[in-house]
Design a protein with these regions (language model features):
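Extracytoplasmic and endomembrane cell-envelope/extracellular-matrix remodeling and assembly machinery
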Residues: 1-2, 8, 12-13, 52, ...
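Alpha-helical scaffolds flanking conserved acidic
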Residues: 16-24, 40, 88-94
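Short, surface-exposed glycine/acidic/tryptophan-bearing loops
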Residues: 33-54
Length: 223
């Protein structure tokens, strides 16, 4: 369900659709994922980077795990990096993974030796050397699934996430009752919220699959 949301945001910004696949490489689309370096959420954002991009991190809410907020931050970051690397998306993705400092240093070293400064020519950490090809390989498999003998699930728009505005804080159990969804599913779709109250210290919205959105809006409006 996250992929639909991210694809919509990437499309709005006219960015390459391959970027939608990065959370697969980063976290397998797990908003609860946390790395050894304390990177969190589907985009695996570290605390300091999160703060630099306005991602609130408190005892009751971590925007790095919020699909909406973290996607906005990740795409903002990549747009900034892309300008820095003159529109080269492979260098942009490499810098997203290892930091722009490392990529710039590797480019400077290659320039000094009279070597090319494209992604494939740079001396980068092993993780980054694998990271970019993984994204490209996933993209190739999706585009040529029949050739690879891969059966892809049929896209189901009703599973896409929708944002439902909250005028007041609401208990997650109440939203579960209104939608017929489980609390655990709601917590996964709204992973930034650490407690059981939505719309309190976190964002003034709740994310639910499209098929439940209208029903929830009506239930909330009727009190």
């Amino acid at each position: 369900p996250y992929m639909y949301w991210i694809a919509g945001q990437v499309k709005k910004r006219n960015m390459p659709m391959e970027l939608v696949l990065l959370p697969i490489v980063e976290s397998a689309f797990d908003p609860h994922a946390t790395s050894g370096a304390n990177a969190a959420g589907i985009w695996q954002i570290i605390p300091s980077t999160g703060r630099n991009y306005g991602l609130k991190q408190t005892r009751s809410y971590d925007a790095r795990r919020d699909v909406v907020a973290s996607t906005t931050a990740a795409l903002d970051m990549m747009q900034r990096l892309n300008k820095m690397f003159d529109g080269d998306w492979l260098l942009t993705v490499a810098a997203y993974n290892s930091g722009e400092g490392r990529v710039l240093k590797a480019m400077k070293a290659n320039k000094a030796r009279g070597k090319s400064t494209d992604f494939w020519s740079l001396s980068l950490p092993q993780e980054t050397k694998i990271y970019v090809p993984k994204m490209l390989a996933l993209s190739d498999i999706l585009k040529n699934s029949k050739r690879y003998g891969v059966q892809l699930p049929t896209p189901d728009e009703s599973r896409a996430l929708a944002r439902v505005r909250l005028s007041n804080p609401v208990d997650i159990q109440q939203v579960a009752d209104m939608t017929g969804m489980s609390v655990s599913k709601l917590k996964t779709f709204n992973a930034g919220v650490k407690g059981s109250t939505l719309g309190a210290s976190g964002p003034q919205y709740v994310m639910v699959p499209q098929k439940h959105a209208e029903q929830l809006r009506e239930s909330l409006a009727s009190g």
